[in-house]
């Protein structure tokens, strides 16, 4: 299993993150608590400067490159959107060129947000895996630095949001976290272990992109088709082996949520909090609602991981 960041690592990462923005809020929303039938806290990662938690990992990844004197001329990576915005933000901060590969048909508004951060955007392939393979090829051809979607230096930054959450609401009994490439869920595990917290961590996958659920059940990486229409942040076809090695022994269990359940959660969160949640951002609430009967009397923490959904799609959901 890959080494998880220590408490000292996470505290140092927080100081890097806070050079760009303050700790995000977490609120106990009355209507969401009423809907869930128990104390419900939301961690608002949709309030970062790129509208998603990924920026934290981008900042610490580039900080580590700078500390090693290894900042490249150009970075290349692949994304469905939020990781790409993270890379664009951090690359611009350090004066590094950034090329991002997205699959064809990617979110129009996420693409626009990346371009606004100075990213050179390339559309290639029919899903994230094909975009990733093309990005690796481009990086090799150009002599550029390929940034993976899962890496220890990304993890230490992402772990800061769970460190914030568990310190702010120490009585949380169970938390739900969506799994895309795995950094968010692995960071929850890292923060829990670093703080010596007893919280149960429940992973959430799309029922239409089940590679992590299938791989955990099988004990090895299992590819699974991706057919989700809403949860592009969880649209992963092949689980990352390093992430899988961390998740498998430490998740309490994994919940699969359908697009219909995600859509209902997006509507509920907007009604209850007037915050916009993208599909992956609403998945944790969808999973908690699915398990509502078992949560009575527990303090439940949910990661609203991002709010970057195209307006026409969100209007259709509402």
Regions found by a protein language model. Name each.
Residues 1-318:
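PLP-dependent amino-acid enzyme catalytic core
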């Amino acid at each position: 299993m890959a080494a998880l960041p220590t408490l000292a690592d996470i505290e140092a990462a927080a100081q890097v993150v806070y050079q760009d923005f303050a700790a995000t809020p977490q609120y106990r929303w009355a209507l969401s608590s009423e809907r869930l039938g128990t104390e419900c806290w939301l961690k608002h990662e949709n309030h970062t400067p790129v509208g998603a938690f990924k920026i934290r990992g981008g900042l610490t990844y580039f900080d580590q490159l700078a500390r090693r004197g290894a900042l490249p001329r150009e970075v290349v990576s692949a994304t469905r959107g939020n990781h790409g915005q993270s890379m664009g933000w951090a690359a611009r901060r350090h004066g590094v060129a950034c090329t991002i590969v997205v699959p064809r048909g990617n979110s129009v508004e996420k693409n626009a947000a990346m371009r606004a951060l100075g990213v050179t955007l390339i559309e290639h392939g029919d899903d994230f895996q094909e975009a990733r393979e093309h990005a690796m090829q481009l990086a090799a051809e150009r002599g550029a630095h390929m940034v993976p979607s899962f890496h220890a230096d990304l993890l230490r930054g992402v772990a800061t949001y769970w460190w914030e959450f568990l310190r702010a609401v120490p009585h949380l009994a169970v938390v739900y976290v969506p799994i895309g490439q795995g950094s968010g869920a692995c960071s929850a595990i890292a923060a829990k272990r670093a703080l010596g917290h007893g919280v149960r961590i429940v992973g959430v996958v799309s029922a239409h992109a089940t590679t992590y659920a299938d791989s955990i059940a099988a004990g090895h990486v299992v590819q699974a088709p991706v057919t989700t229409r809403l949860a592009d942040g969880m649209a992963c076809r092949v689980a990352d082996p390093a992430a899988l090695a961390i998740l498998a022994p430490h998740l309490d269990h994994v919940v699969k949520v359908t697009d219909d359940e995600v859509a209902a959660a997006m509507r509920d969160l907007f009604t209850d909090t007037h915050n916009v949640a993208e599909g992956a951002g609403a998945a944790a609430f969808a999973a908690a609602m699915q398990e509502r009967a078992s949560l009575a009397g527990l303090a439940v923490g949910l990661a609203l991981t991002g709010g970057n959904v195209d307006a026409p799609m969100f209007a259709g959901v509402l």
